[in-house]
């Protein structure tokens, strides 16, 4: 009899079991979206680093060999130069980018600002004022390809790109040799900049070549002078910092993807003891501004 009573004391009623299951379900419903979102964010961060390590390094090697300006257009560059450095499974001309998993439908992708937009197919669709560049052809078209890891890439190329100039103000767009917009999962959702869509930008046709793929915050930090711009980023989000002048130039060149249509922004790069480097998102101008001047601030995570 005692044994039977012991068993009955530890038994659960159906109501208790259902209540427990219900509580577990509620907790799971609260926690799972956060866990899934954090997992996705890590995947997007890994994709950005992979794109930078593969595309950026491949173009850098071409540059070091002195061949970065030898191609005639984006198609020639991909087919006859990039293919020697990067495993490419498929290529597509500008009229058939969707065959390479690049969504080109009208308003089918989301900018970083979460506004509907159309994937750029010509250089002039990348940023405001890009035609101000002296050696940048705004009508130049992109070329598409699929990497061996499944990433879809929409690549822009400038055979006339110029070396860096740290002694004078200049047009930033003229320093971009290659700009590659990637989509880690092709036509699949979410097709959103900052998530499955990002970009790798390669600057300068010489040994000073730089490849960057900034992870850009969705909104501006508070405007500030050069001295306080970094702190403005930290106040917005401690994981973010002020971009250097090359990262900031890449952001301008892809400003339509980011939803940044105007403004003058500080970089973290000094021009002199009194001057810092800034970037105009209105016309592409790279300028040296007084460190005491107040400009816009947009932050990045590395």
Can you describe what each PLM-predicted range is?
Residues 8-40:
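N-terminal single-pass transmembrane signal-anchor helix
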Residues 221-240:
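A short alpha-helix/helix-coil micro-patch that ends at or immediately precedes a cysteine
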Residues 1-7:
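N-terminal secretory signal peptides that target proteins for export/translocation
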Residues 212, 229, 266-267:
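Bulky hydrophobic/aromatic "packing anchor" residues in well-ordered structure
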Residues 239, 245-302:
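C-terminal, surface-exposed recognition/capping segments
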Residues 76-211:
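Intrinsically disordered, low-complexity regions enriched in Pro/Ser/Thr/Gly and acidic residues
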Residues 41-82:
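Membrane-proximal N-terminal amphipathic helix
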Residues 153, 186-197, 221-227, 247-250, ...:
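Short, surface-exposed beta-strand/loop "edge" segments at domain boundaries and coil↔beta transitions
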């Amino acid at each position: 009899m005692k044994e039977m009573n012991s068993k009955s004391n530890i038994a659960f009623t159906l109501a208790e079991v259902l209540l427990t299951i219900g509580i577990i379900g509620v907790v799971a419903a609260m926690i799972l979206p956060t866990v899934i979102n954090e997992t996705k964010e890590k995947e997007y961060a890994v994709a950005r680093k992979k794109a930078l390590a593969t595309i950026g390094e491949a173009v850098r090697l071409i540059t070091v060999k002195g061949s970065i300006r030898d191609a005639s257009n984006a198609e020639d560059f991909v087919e006859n130069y990039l293919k020697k450095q990067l495993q490419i499974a498929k290529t597509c001309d500008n009229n058939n980018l969707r065959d390479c998993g690049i969504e080109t439908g009208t308003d089918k992708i989301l900018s970083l600002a979460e506004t509907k937009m159309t994937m750029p197919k010509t250089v002039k669709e990348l940023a405001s004022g890009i035609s101000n560049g002296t050696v940048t052809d705004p009508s130049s078209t992109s070329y598409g390809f699929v990497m061996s890891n499944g990433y879809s890439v929409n690549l822009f190329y400038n055979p006339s790109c110029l070396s860096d100039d740290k002694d004078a103000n200049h047009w930033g767009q003229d320093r971009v040799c290659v700009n590659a917009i990637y989509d880690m999962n092709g036509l699949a959702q979410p097709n959103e900049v900052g998530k499955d869509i990002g970009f790798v930008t390669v600057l300068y046709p010489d040994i000073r070549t730089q490849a960057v793929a900034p992870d850009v915050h969705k909104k501006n930090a508070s405007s500030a002078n050069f001295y306080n711009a970094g702190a403005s980023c930290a106040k917005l989000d401690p994981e973010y910092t002020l971009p250097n002048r090359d990262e900031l130039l890449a952001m301008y060149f892809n400003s339509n993807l980011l939803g940044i249509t105007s403004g003058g922004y500080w970089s973290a790069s000094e021009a002199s003891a009194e001057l810092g480097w800034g970037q105009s998102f209105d016309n592409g101008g790279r300028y040296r501004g007084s460190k005491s001047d107040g400009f816009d601030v947009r932050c990045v995570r590395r």
